[in-house]
Amino acid sequence: MKSVITTVISAADAAGRFPSNSDLESIQGNIQRSAARLEAAEKLAGNHEAVVKEAGDACFAKYAYLKNPGEAGENQEKINKCYRDVDHYMRLVNYDLVVGGTGPLDEWGIAGAREVYRTLNLPTSAYVASIAYTRDRLCVPRDMSAQAGVEFSAYLDYLINALS
C-alpha cells in the first residue's frame, strides 16, 4: 500500500541509494501531521453513518433526476447501492488518513472507477457532489481541529479530483 514512507523508500531503493535529506524531511512532515490525520480518521469513523447519509441525501437533492426511471437511483435497491458506494469512498478516505497517503484510494477506489461508472450509467458527478458536500459541510472546531480538518479536506479534494 502506497504511503509517503513507502514511496520514499521505494524511490531510494530503485535508485540504489539511501533516502536523501529531503526524503527524510518529507517523512518527518508526514509523521508530524499524523496526530491530526488520526484525529480526523477517528471523527470520521465515529460519525460515518451520518456523514454518508448526509452526503447521499445532498447528492439526490442536487440531482433529483437520478430517481427517474432508467437512472442510477430509480428504485430503493439502486439508491442503497449509491449510499454503499459513498460509504466505501469514506472508508477509503479514512484508511488514507490512517496510512498518511493515497494508497487505499488509488488501489481500491479510483483505479477503473470512471470506466465502471460509465459502463453502468452511473454519473461520477453525483459521487463528486456527495464528496464535495462532505468537504464543504466540515466545520472547525465543531467537527474536528483545524489541522485535522486540513488533512481530511485534502483527501476529499484528492478523491474529488480523481473522480472528476
UniProtKB/Swiss-Prot annotation:
Residues binding (2R,3E)-phycoerythrobilin 1, per UniProt: 82
Predominant place of localization: plastid
Reported function: Light-harvesting photosynthetic bile pigment-protein from the phycobiliprotein complex.
Listed name of the protein: B-phycoerythrin alpha chain
Binding locations of (2R,3E)-phycoerythrobilin 2: 139
Family listed: Belongs to the phycobiliprotein family.
GO cellular component, one term: phycobilisome
GO-annotated biological processes: photosynthesis
Modification note: Contains two covalently linked bilin chromophores.
